[in-house]
Swiss-Prot record:
Residues 73-265 form the ABC transmembrane type-1 domain. It comes from Streptococcus pneumoniae (strain ATCC BAA-255 / R6). This is Maltodextrin transport system permease protein MalD. The lineage of its organism: Bacteria, Bacillati, Bacillota, Bacilli, Lactobacillales. InterPro entries: BP-dep_ABC_trans_perm, MetI-like, MetI-like_sf. It is a multi-pass membrane protein. It is found in: Cell membrane. CDD domains: TM_PBP2 (cd06261). One of its GO terms (cellular component) is plasma membrane.
Amino acid sequence: MNNSIKLKRRLTQSLTYLYLIGLSIVIIYPLLITIMSAFKAGNVSAFKLDTNIDLNFDNFKGLFTETLYGTWYLNTLIIALITMAVQTSIIVLAGYAYSRYNFLARKQSLVFFLIIQMVPTMAALTAFFVMALMLNALNHNWFLIFLYVGGGIPMNAWLMKGYFDTVPMSLDESAKLDGAGHFRRFWQIVLPLVRPMVAVQALWAFMGPFGDYILSSFLLREKEYFTVAVGLQTFVNNAKNLKIAYFSAGAILIALPICILFFFLQKNFVSGLTSGGDKG
């Protein structure tokens, strides 16, 4: 009986390791191609992994001199930063309100949030375009920010509310007995305990504009207003020769601010679990 259990356990572990190895190959292989393509001189094949590594920055220079990549990058960075700040602030406040207070139409609005999530972005493109025409908002970053922020609130507010629900109400009640007001209880007691989820929400909000192509390509028509996703795709489509190396260089630069933000926020993923219970 024991041998059978051990054999089953080993088989499960072996299958798990095989799955993880296969998944790692699927993820790492295109990543290696992208990195090596970006630093190689001349054009390269999109499907061939060349082990000869060059440290050549001509592709990065060409990307900035032959395209408006610098402008696209700045556009995207501004949109991402504002979206992250506004969306995260609204989500945190909304999640706290739904978790801690009973107010009119509370349950109905939560259900409405879920219904909104059932409508795919593609189905709303026509409405967004008509709205942009009515507001004269085509080729305007503020309209994209408005859509990104609004689109991320419903589901993320649900997630944030669920995370706030894990914080015991006894902490709020103890702080209230000590004379803490609504804002102080939120800011000093509860918010530090949900910092891991706040960090995740901020990272998601920041990543969205860098990865979005459909919405931005639909609302941005002039090159100087493009985001990096639209700009790179347009450049590759219009190029006489397929310049995979330029595209790879652009992809690496897209990943840089996301990685930097992750390293700045990663300490919050753990520290928030123990940093709020002793404040009041």
